[in-house]
A protein has these predicted regions:
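HotDog/MaoC-like acyl-thioester-processing domains
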Residues: 2, 7, 11-29, 33-43, ...
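Hot-dog-fold acyl-thioester-processing enzymes
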Residues: 2, 7, 15-110, 172-173
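Well-ordered beta-strand positions in beta-sheet-rich domains
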Residues: 48-50, 116, 160-164
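Mid-chain, well-packed structural core segment of small domains
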Residues: 104-127
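Short, intrinsically disordered/low-complexity patches at protein termini
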Residues: 71-73, 83-84, 111-112, 117-118, ...
Length: 173
């Protein structure tokens, strides 16, 4: 069993190599990955990651989820929709929020209790998504943490919402 220090670091993953991500001065994500226990969380603590959504990501998500809606996969079909082109699955974008929560804040050992999301704009193949999570409320006795969640593409918010999680605690090591 791992002992959780203030932040237990895991080896970093390779950053996204999308060219648009390189144009921005912010790093792909703020490391370390691992666990921040409930005892060490503070209101306003924030983590993020940046990912270019590729055609391959969309195809793999369609395969895993079995959501093969042609608006995600068929250029000709998608051109005739209100989106005027293919878009990524909304839940693929939401999955980036899950990655921040499960890998960084609070990180490993976190249990999802609920999430509400609003999808505000489409994400297209080639878009670079910034997924951000910020601690809004902490119920220390119950180990419950409410997180504000947001995804942006450039200056456009494409997704916003909140998540309720059960954070790991050192006293259960």
């Amino acid at each position: 069993m791992l002992h959780r220090n203030k932040i237990h670091e895991s080896p970093p993953m390779a950053p996204s190599n999308g060219t648009r991500a390189m144009l921005d001065s912010r790093p792909n994500d703020n490391l370390p990955r691992g666990t921040i226990c409930i005892e060490d969380l503070e209101i306003g603590l924030s983590r993020h990651l940046r990912k270019e959504v590729t055609d391959r990501d969309i195809e793999l998500f369609a395969e895993v989820s079995t959501d093969r809606n042609p608006v995600h996969l068929d250029d000709d079909y998608a051109r005739d929709t209100i989106f005027e082109g293919r878009i990524a699955h909304g839940m693929l974008t939401a999955g980036l929020i899950s990655a921040v929560i499960g890998e960084q804040l609070p990180g490993h050992g976190t249990i999802y209790m609920g999430q509400s999301l609003k999808f505000l704009a489409p994400v297209r193949p080639g878009d670079v998504v910034l997924a951000e999570v910020t601690v809004r409320e902490i119920d220390y006795p119950k180990r419950r943490v409410t997180l504000d969640c947001r995804c942006t593409v450039g200056n456009t918010t494409v997704l916003k919402g909140e998540a309720l999680v059960l954070a790991p605690s050192r006293k259960f090591d």
